[in-house]
Amino acid sequence: MKKIVFVLVLMLSSFGAFGQETVSGQFSDALSTPITAEVYKQACDPPLPPAEVSSDWDCCDVCCNPACAGC
């Protein structure tokens, strides 16, 4: 019984420590959001269509298209 309680406590404590929703007080984390947003913006700017335009170019070559969940 003690082992089960220990495992449950360990799981709950690690969930909070490794979760993505945790807030860090480090200064470097404050800068990560604008940098990430800028990289995302640059990565999602649609390039010029290729010389041979295919019918699915709008979907699979532009990463910000919400219709392209798998691309």
From Swiss-Prot:
Where does this protein come from, organism-wise? Yersinia enterocolitica
Single GO molecular function: toxin activity
Q: What is the lineage of its organism?
A: Bacteria, Pseudomonadati, Pseudomonadota, Gammaproteobacteria, Enterobacterales
What family is reported? Belongs to the heat-stable enterotoxin family.
The protein's location, in the record's own words, is: Secreted
Q: Which UniProt keywords apply?
A: Disulfide bond, Enterotoxin, Secreted, Signal, Toxin, Virulence
Transmembrane annotation, as ranges:
none
Which region is the signal sequence? 1-19
- Coiled-coil blocks: none
The propeptide segment or segments lie at 20-53
Q: What is this protein called?
A: Heat-stable enterotoxin A
Q: What does this protein do?
A: Toxin which activates the particulate form of guanylate cyclase and increases cyclic GMP levels within the host intestinal epithelial cells.
| Record-linked InterPro entries | Heat-stable_enterotox_CS, Heat-stable_enterotox_STa
The family database entries (Pfam families) matched by this protein are listed as: Enterotoxin_ST
Report further notes. Answer: Transcription reached a maximum at the entry to the stationary phase and significantly varied in different Y.enterocolitica strains.
The conditions that induce or repress this protein are given as: In cultured cells, expressed only at temperatures <30 degrees Celsius. Under conditions of high osmolarity and alkaline pH (as it is the case in the host's intestine), it is expressed at 37 degrees Celsius.
Q: Which cysteines are joined by disulfide bonds?
A: C59-C64, C60-C68, C63-C71
Give Gene Ontology CC terms: extracellular space
